[in-house]
Amino acid sequence: MAAFEYQQAEEIRDALARHGVRYLFIGKSGAILLGFPDTTQDADLFVERSPGNGAALVSAIRELGFDLTDAQAAEIVRGKDFVQLKSGPFDLELVFAPDGIERFADAWARRVDVEGFPVCHPDDIIASKAATNRVKDRESLPRLRAFRDYWASRRRG
């Protein structure tokens, strides 16, 4: 399994933009786009839950080369909380209800634009990792918090 790469993020951004999908990069892939020095095996997307957005996402994912089953497409359209896709050119995790984030609209209002990539704010990435409470997420929290503080200080100037 290959690591998440910038080119994959570009392909995702461009395909989802062509189909008008509302989403945010979240998780470690989102942190990496913000400059966090780490690797991950997949792209994590927080997707706005609505039938229209889900249908647009299915079209975009198929355009990217994913071989979706009818059941997977239906899960995406209805906004199943979590959909993991390994049937394409890279691994993709779609999260419609991430732990630690109440509403997509709130995360969207706090988003950070990085070269046209809509990315969850570091505070939201941290909140989600903390709420998930997996060992690997707990282990990364101190580094993510230190990065967030560094990132915030650089933005202030």
What are the functions of these language-model segments?
Residues 1-157:
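Compositionally biased terminal segments of proteins
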